[in-house]
Amino acid sequence: MLVFAVIFFVFALPSLFGRDVEIYVEDRDLEIPLEGALIRSWDGTEYECDEDGKVFISVPDDRQVVVQGAYPGYENGRLAISLGRDHFTLALHLSGIMENRELVIEASRPGVSESRSGRSVAISGPELARTAEIGIIEDVMTSIKLLPGVGYSGMFNAMPSIRGGDPGDLEAVLDGFYLARPYHWGGGVSIFDPKMISSAQLSHGVFSTRYGHTISGLLEITSKKADPTEMELDVGLSTSAASINLSYPLFGKGGIMFMGKVTYWDLLVWTAQGISKAAPGNETLDLINAVSTAPYIRSAALSANYRFTTDLELTLNGFFGSDGVGASYNTSYDEDGLLGGEVAGDDGISGSVAMDFDYHNYQGFGIAGLTFNPMPTMALRATAGVGYTELIAEGLVNNDVIVSYNQKFLDIYDNPFVSIFNPLIPPVYAPILPPTGTYHAPDLNAGINSDNLVFNAQARFDMDWDLGKGFLVALGVQELYTNWKQYEDVGLFMESYMQPGFVNNKYDLLAIYGTPFLTAVIWPFHKIVDVNNHGLFSSAYTLMEYTTPNQFFGTEVGIRMDHLYFSGKGFSVPADPIWSPRANFDFNILKNKDLFGISNFLESFSFTAGTGLFSSMNENISFIEEGNDGLESLKLNRSWTTVIGTKLDFAGGFSFNIEGYYKQVFNRAHIMADITFDSADSVNVKWGFDGEGRIWGFDLQLQKLASRYIDGWISYTFTNAKYYEPSNSEFGFGGIGGGEEEDNDWYYPSFHRFHNFNLVLNIKPVKQFSIALRFGFASGQPTTKTTYGEVYPYPVQQADWDETLQKYVPRLDENGNQVIIQKFRRDAIGREETRGPWSLPLDLKFSFFIFDKKGKVQTEIYLGAENLLSLVYKPQETGTTFNEYTGKEDTGSNSASFDLPIPMVSFGFKWSY
């Protein structure tokens, strides 16, 4: 009720503190309206003029204020808003002199972000900053995750599901350049700092054939350009980050911008570690104590633009970033076998387990773009660039543990021994157990050293040609080369269950051991992965747009071709060309018309419908090795999407949009279940390219455009998504990494949520103070609740690989006896498919502003808090973890609601000039 009371109160604020005035912006000489002109209000808020050059803004009703107007190619203007009037005109004139040139009002160039029903939703300017700059991490993806059609993914997950698609299907593009893995912390946050971005557009419908390489969602990022006439400086410092942004003009024809930022979590980790020690028992917080290197991010970006003439512009963008984290964890068990507070001797374990892990990620890219207008009706753009990302991970787990055989195990392990796995095997004598009644557990000595490098080089050429009379044609070609390098040195112990008649002499334990009852064996596995694969994507597209003179009807139809040539060490796979036709149809039923006398209430009403095909490559395919089964049938992921929607624009800056969609996924790549081990260091992975998906749903958004006192939006998304892998049907489950299963092998994926709701508000009661609020709820993700039978021990024989015999042989102890360890198991007797708890994120930010008299310097002091409801909301437990070495359940819950059970608080200031 408190939230709704606040909403009601702030909606009443305009009537208490101000008034709305209309500003009309025109060309001084031609006296024509300037659509898209920006009005910067007295408090720094920006407003955009409509197609008639008009905009409504809120101003104080007790004094005169001054606003600024800006439009590309025109000199900035100032306008005094005096008392007693409600309508004002601001006339701007062209900057400089253009001889023998005609004035042309151009449409937005390709790549400019805009919200279009059935295609995309865009966020830019102040609303982007307000939603992305609330928490301890300022990230554009924080804003994207609040848009309709986006599934909740948690506080530290920048890879959401877009309209039921796999999170990995989302493709990011910066100024036309495809980015490989634009994330820090393994996908926890993105590299897109709001200070370097002017707008972000999420295309989750039937978007233009200009772009491909995705079957679910395209994120188009437009970089920020430096002001060509004024220097700008922004400095920020908070409890978790320090940043600087400098923009410098270049002779009035462009500018250069630098951004540097360091994110440090030392204070946050130190605080969490203190809380965990003061309130022990929370397993999630206890893990914080293992952090040896606090999570960090270091990034720098450089952008420049220069307009040589009115028809020729050069843009440059560069980025470099690094991030990492380190952990060191040590668990000790006392001589009595104390483990996690159990009764002394209950587990019979003494010793220690140590774990060390270090993760570092590096990435960078450089992009150059040239835009040329050879004639007023044609725009040409060439883009080229290179990029790379490298992930280095090192981990090691060691243990020095002595375990006592418990009595239940000794009762089972008796001579003569009858196999509990196969009663038909005659009784035999088992290997002798040590007289001490204990054994030295095998040192896991599990380690991984990984170096994963992705390099890409790409170029594209695009042309837009306005043919007149509402017709526009566009075409383009693109080349994208990618080199995937992966080196991994993995060592660990694996357990196998072998039965008589197992057809692989390397694992024929009956022949090796002569003890047929020992059907379980733990053996060392060592694997070196050395992959060097190449992929060349060649693409071409063409499209045509048409709009009737009265803008009642518009359409965009096009077709795209993508071809992949994939090769690696000893193999090459030329895939067939993929054709992707797409079409959109728009009907502006009410625009600039008085239909049924309601134009004063409903300003526009439009309807849209679209359908099209899309394709992408599963990233996991990039690390396929020679000999992997299924490689010869490599296919690209495909989807067919159909969208219908309607949008209504109301008086007062309100808009409502609702869209429904159906998406059919096919040729989806997946790893099949029959993974086999050919030798001690050889793994054969079988791939399938027959995965399917059926996704349908709808989303809606009610938005209040930027205004003086309150703005924001409410969005709701419903998604029903099921997947199916026919190749895995014979194994009796939906697929590896799947979620909630269905009887017919169609299953809900692990990332699926039926319901997602977001409320975003920006409240500005006075010029010097604002409140930013983000609240949402999301239904739970699929999970399985399993009922188990009795826990019982079983013997496991430890094995080593014999290089001479090329077989696994028994490991012997110091007395020459075969090493036998005890493990525990429990059989599932029932399964219930259910859902995890609902997520209820609530974030708040309080900002205080200080302005100088000239309005050029602004200081912001803010206090932000994320995950506030974690103080009062306790998610239900959804399961425990069974310890195979102790036979007990480790307590704890699997929460899908919060990343940490405490609010994340940040405090800082920002200074801008």
What residue ranges belong to the model's regions?
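A short, solvent-exposed loop/turn motif at the edges and junctions
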Residues: W42, Q64, Q68-A80, P110
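Short, acidic Ser/Thr/Gly-rich low-complexity loop/linker segments typical of extracellular
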Residues: G44-V55
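Periplasmic N-terminal accessory/gating domains of Gram-negative outer-membrane beta-barrel systems
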Residues: E75, S82, H87-F88, V104-G111, ...
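Transmembrane beta-barrel wall of Gram-negative outer-membrane proteins
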Residues: S240-Y264, K277-N330, D358-A382, V386, ...
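Face-selective signature of the C-terminal outer-membrane beta-barrel domain
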Residues: R307-S322, F357-G570, N657, Y709, ...
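Gram-negative outer-membrane beta-barrel transporters
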Residues: T547-F553, Y662-Q664, V685-Y788
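Surface-exposed extracellular loop regions of Gram-negative outer-membrane beta-barrel proteins
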Residues: F587-T642, Y662-K686, R774-Y788, Y873-Q876
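C-terminal beta-signal and adjacent terminal beta-strands/loops
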Residues: Q768, G776-L805, V809-I820, P841, ...
